[in-house]
Amino acid sequence: KKLGVHVKKKKIKPWRFDMARNESLKLVPDDFDICVCTDLDEVLEKGWRQKLETIWDSNINRLYYQYNWSLDEQNQPIISFYSDKIHSRKNYQWTHPVHEVLTYLGPTKEELKVTDKIVLNHYPDRSKSRSSYLPLLELSVKEDPEDDRNMHYLGREYMYYGRWNDCIDTLIKHLQLNSATWKDERCASMRFIARSYKNLKRYEEAKMWLDKAIIEAPYLREPYAERVLLEYQLKNYQKVIEYGSKALEIKEHPKSYMNEPFSYDETIYDMMAISYYELGDYQKSLEYNKMALKINPNNERIQNNQIILENLIQKKN
């Protein structure tokens, strides 16, 4: 209000994100052409409006744009994917109590366009509680038990809460749905099942599910990287090197909300360096430690490992 914004208030009881967004959408005049939906913790990079007006035409219903969901201290993206909350004013409504999505209701086929020119950055409040998400996700699955996306989200949320058995049961249900056909998401469900088994110390079942995840999406680094983490925890250093090498063969980094930072940061190089050290191959260890240090030059432990390895090799020679 202090900035001159015309603020409208409405109580949504019980709280649902879809209902709140639909009430917000009703406030947009019917003669507007384009709606750009952002949250208070999201900031569009400068020049977005001019770019949008250049890209948009009357045939487009929805625009996909780059969404940097997570950024590092230098404001460089860690996890990026395409979001789709720029849309035409008419023929849309929000659905699902949480992790709400825009549902197209138009009489003709929805026309989509993708751009990398418009970028939205996410700066979340880390102190904000997520406690409302779980009951809303449970409600969402109850309302639409055949929706694969929300079944996946619910299983993932159980994992966040350390409810390992609930996570496993829910994600197996996700994989059994006829609509659950997106291999990347299926792979993520399998990884999360494996992660739950790992936390239950049922390591062979964790390995089995990671094998399934690799078969499901062999083009993704994530299942290999997850296997690296497991084998490292179990001190199976030869296996760390085996799966780490396979992970590093995959160069493509697709934009997806299921990207795991540990798949593309220094983690794999670091664990391979330590594994080579444990197996007595100091030269290889140094090689991978250098690569880890190149990605994260401020990591003191990796810096110290570099000095130790260089001294060991020097003494050996």
List where the protein language model places each region:
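Active-site nucleotide-sugar/metal-binding loop of Leloir-type enzymes
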Residues: N22-I34
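Acidic donor-binding segment of Leloir-type glycosyltransferases
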Residues: K1-P14, E23, E242-E249
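Catalytic-site signature of metal-activated, phosphate-bearing donor transferases
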Residues: M19-L25, V43-D169, K173
